[in-house]
Amino acid sequence: MEGKTSSGFELHHGHSKDHRPDLKQLVFCLSICEDGAVPVHHKVYPGNTNDASTHIETWNTLRLIHGRSDFIYVGDSKLCGQPQLDYITDNHGRAITIVPSNWLEVERFKNMLRAGPIKKKLIWRKPKPNDESKTEYYSFYEGHAITQLLDKYSLWWFVSSEKRKRDRYSREDRLRKAKASLIELSVKINRGKLKKKGDIETAALEILKKRHVQHLMEITVKKHMERKQVLRRGRVGNKFQYERTCRVYYSLHWEQDRDALRQETRVDGLFPLLSTDPTIHPRDVLKIYKYQPRLEKRFSQFKSIHQAAPLLFKRIDRIEANMFVFFLSLMVQAIIERMVRQQIKERKLKPLKLYPEERDAPHPTTSQILKTFDGLCTYKITQEDSTIEEYQDQLDYTHRQVLELMDIEEEEYWKI
C-alpha cells in the first residue's frame, strides 16, 4: 500500500514480532495517565520508526496536554538514552525507566552479586497479578549507584520474588533445550562436516550461544583412536602380509558448571530502574514504574477485544483515521472501567458477579460489563406501522447494580 498522509504517516517494512518481514507495518504510540490508565494521547508512525525517536515528541505533546512539565514520564527501555533523558531534564521534566540489560552498569553490578551477596531490604509487598491469594515481594539493594554512562541519574537495584521464579524457570528451560540439542548433535558427529574436532566444538558452542547458556555449561570433545589388523586380499601363504589401520573418531561430552549456576542464582529477579529525580524515594520509583503493565493491557485490548486490523482499510488516510477511532474506543472503554471501579471502591461494595456461575469480578473490565447485557431485548407489537405494545426483558440485580454504578437510569438504558 503506497502513499503518505499530510502528517507524514506511511507504511514501511520494519521489525516484525510475528516473524513476517515481508509485511509492511506501522508503529502505534499510546500514552495513558495514572488516573484509571485512561489513554490521553496517540500517534501512528511508519513501521521502520525506532521507538526511541518517538519519546521526545510524545513528551512535548503530553506537556501541552498537561499544561506543565514537572509530571513524571514513565517509559520502557527505549527511553533510557542520553538524548531523550537530557531533553526531558533540560526542560524541567522527570522520567523513570528500566535500564537495558546490555548496559555496562548492569553487567558490572551482576558480577558484584556473583562474587558475593550484597545486603538488601524488603520494601514492598503486593498481591500477585491475576492471583491475589499470593503475595509478590520486592527488595531493594541498599545504597544507590550513579550511572557512569550518563553521569547524573540515579540507578536503583530491585529484586522481585516473582521475577526470580521466572528467571530460574527460564534458565532451567534453556538448559534443558540445550542438552536436547547436544544429544541430537552427538549422533551426527564423525561424518559429513563434523569429522574434525574444531568443527564439532564450534557446532556445540553455537547451540549454547543460541540458548544463552554458554557460561553455564562446559563442552569437551574427546579424541579416540581405533586400531585394526586386516588381512589383505589373496591366498594365505608364506609371503602373506597383514595391514594395520587406524581410525580416529571423537565423542562429545558436556556438564553443567555448578559454580557458575550457583553464582547465577544470585542475580535472579534483579532489575534496575533509572530516575532523573534523585528526591523520589526508591519505593516510590518502583511503585510508579510498576504501573507500566496497565499500558500493556491497553495494547492487549486494542488487539484482542477491538481486533484492530488497520491494513484492511485499503487507503493510507483511512488507516490513520481509523487508528484515531480505535484510540477513542480505548479511551471510552477505560473511562467506563474507571467509573465503575471508583464507585465500587468509594462505596466499599462487594465484587460484581460478572462471570459465569455468578463468580466475582474484583477488577471489572468494560468487555465484562457489556457482556452482562448480551441477550437483553426489546419486543414491539405493531399493527399497520404503529406500535401497539412494547415490552423489555427483566433486568436482574447485577444489571441494575451496573447501571447504578454508571449513573444510568433504567429508562435511559432501554433508549440507547
Residue ranges and their predicted role:
Residues 1-416:
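Anion-binding and metal-coordination hotspots
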